[in-house]
Amino acid sequence: MAIPDEAGAGHRVHGMGLAMEAPTWPAITPEEAAAVLAHYPQAARIEALRWHSPRPFSAATLIDTTEGMLLVKRHDRRVRTAAGLAEEHRFIAHLAAAGAPVPEIWRTGEGESAVALGEATYEVHRQAPGDDLYRDRLSWTPFRSLAHAHAAGVSLARLHLASLGYGAPPRAVQPLVASFGILSATDPMAAAEAYVAARPALAAFLAGHAWRRRLSSLFAAWGEGLARHIAGQPPLWTHNDWHPSNLLWAADETVRTVFDFGLADRSCAAHDLAIAIERTAFAWLDLGEGHDDAIADPASALSLIAGYEAISPIDPAMMESIIAMLPLVHVEFALSEIDYFAGVVGDRDAGMLAWEGYLLGHADWFGSAAGRDFLAELRARRKL
């Protein structure tokens, strides 16, 4: 008897802008899901595929089995090998042991947390508790409310406490990781040179775009004293993609589960908080639409910070590090995204949008009057 797929027909995913697009990575099929779950002796019989994720960088589906719901996620092996997923899964296991509300990662009969089949790598999670209130929302879209921003700050602080003691080294070179080797360097331009040189597809893409001059200009504008600020922040493994769509929510508007650790790496708490603000306090998808001076929401950023401080104090040095990083905190992941578009997908237009609109455009906004006002308001409200 065929396994029903209730959402596979006409499946679309989020594009780089506001429009939905045909997926780069096709939806997982019932036959494919069955082949993956055959590696997990604890898996029960599949009843139906209920939902396919609209996220563009991988494919994922919620599967109804006779013993509950599972999430099966597929990655192209050029993006995540089994070893790359194991880096994430070891961090998640540490967080779970410390009491953090994270997904339960299933292991195969051989004890592995990922399965490699053909050109793909798969992971299987038990469906985590909580409502996926933001699952259809694009990245860089704000919280629904200041209460959600505050709750997200509380949850982030608790996650950072759970992360303490996890001493794994930084992740291996691979696409779509928010690593922390450029901003933390005493010479960020030299670190950027090394980053690009280690990624041939990225280097080839950037070759015609005067990238050294343009990055040097950004570091000159925003990098002074940055390494000194960061040097005082304790290293910590962090989530690095703190957006409400990566949180499952309880009925009382608190965070029930934290998921999607794909961008996680060793950085510091200030870096993770800066990313959280960059992801949630700006309507970046409206940038260039004629009202750039109105895309920022300092109240949301301050609510996030207040929630964090309800659990963990933010001293003046940490707060200054967060503010100093904000104009550049996206740079390393933007380069990683360009590497993905150039080296894995072969989508030059998306790569150009990531370079011009994301990496350069977001940083340039902070140099505008509205951007400088936003940073000044954070400082003033924090009495720095």
Positions of predicted regions on the chain:
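Juxta-kinase regulatory segment immediately upstream of eukaryotic protein kinase catalytic domains
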Residues: 2-47
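An alpha-helical support segment within catalytic cores of ATP-dependent transferases
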Residues: 29-39, 168, 191-239, 381
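Active-site acidic catalytic loop and adjacent metal/ATP-binding pocket
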Residues: 56-66, 71-72, 105, 220-271
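ATP-binding pocket architecture of kinase catalytic cores
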Residues: 66-167
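A glycine-centered beta->alpha junction motif in the catalytic cores
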Residues: 125-141, 195-200, 331-347
